[in-house]
Amino acid sequence: MKRLFFVLFASMALAFGASAQTAEEIVARMDKETEKGDTQGLAMTMSMKIPIVGEFSTRIKARGDYSKAESTVKGEKVIFWSDTKTTWTYTANNNELVIEPSKGSQNDEGELVKGITSGYDVSIKGETADAWQIKCVKQKSNQDKDDPKTMDLVVSKKTYLPVRLVAKVKMVTVTLSNFALGVSPEEVKFDQSAYKDAKVIDKR
């Protein structure tokens, strides 16, 4: 009987050990999943909490070199579109469309989650039935002054996509959430015919 219990216990221990994953393995799998956004498109919500100014959120969609961001700040709705050459900014309150050359050569919105834990030590601080809670601590070798000292990351056990990432940069708390794969080109490409009545300011 004792031998039977020992065999059962050993089998359970082996099974648990085989299924357990380290924080590094979870993050590596997460990076692999978010890379699919290059071809499938990736959407997320970025919320910022700023002292005095308050809190506002932006819904971001990106696919390849194209991106679209919609934000409402103090009742004013603003929509941004961009590709490698041009940026369009539409302000709903005054029905104004500003067209400018893009400042970057790539889709910055799509890069928000790529290698986001690079330069950080990661460890599992807890888990639920649905997700892992991972603590990210900035490495001493990371000399980027803009990188926060710590980040709190939650990763879905089902999809391996981030569920939420919270970081504090100086006095600003930034939260990335509501991640989803699957964005069509039509969702992110600017269609000027939809804004033919807007006042256009072309700065190209």
Predicted regions mapped to residue ranges:
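Short, solvent-exposed coil/turn segments at beta-strand boundaries
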Residues: 38-39, 60-68, 81-87, 128, ...
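Non-transmembrane domains of secretory- and envelope-associated proteins
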Residues: 21, 26-29, 51, 128-132, ...
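Flexible, surface-exposed loop/linker segments and immediately adjacent secondary-structure boundaries
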Residues: 94-95, 101-129
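Short, surface-exposed charged micro-motifs
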Residues: 57-59, 77-79, 121-123, 150-154, ...
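Sec-dependent signal peptide recognition
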Residues: 2-8
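An acidic-aromatic
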Residues: 57-107, 170-175
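N-terminal leader/targeting segments and the immediate start of mature chains
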Residues: 5, 16-57, 61-65, 194-204
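A short hydrophobic beta-strand element
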Residues: 40-46, 130-137
